[in-house]
């Protein structure tokens, strides 16, 4: 179990892990390591064909249960112990694969939500399983929270993503500008009242 990745890349999650049992904390850390590995493959600065090869190899190792890789072994252990659907993990792979193109262009709100579900809603769902959540409404909430966190990350990383030739919200510039103007007017009203 490597908490170092969690501590290095996800400080908030690392500190939150102290409030969990050791077993749950280890499972959360293993899930993080798996997701981080996929994310690192997608964000690698190598040439696209190398990234695609690394992604394909990791996915193949996952599907073939290549337990020579401890990250894959730990992920399969979580899938089995927490009854996580393999489809959820495949959805995660599909989402990450979206980022393995020369140009990433999300063209509709529906596509943006599907992408966000795949790369983050799935993680919320898997975390819920690890945390023993059984309430179906809470599971839906976990998916929605994952999507919301992804949309927040996309909004935060617009410039960085543009440098990587990824445009998730470019088609919504007018909507975003209008929303910001409305928010700013509401803000001004609040401080002047």
Which sequence ranges carry the predicted segments?
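Acidic catalytic motifs of isoprenoid enzymes
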Residues: 1-193
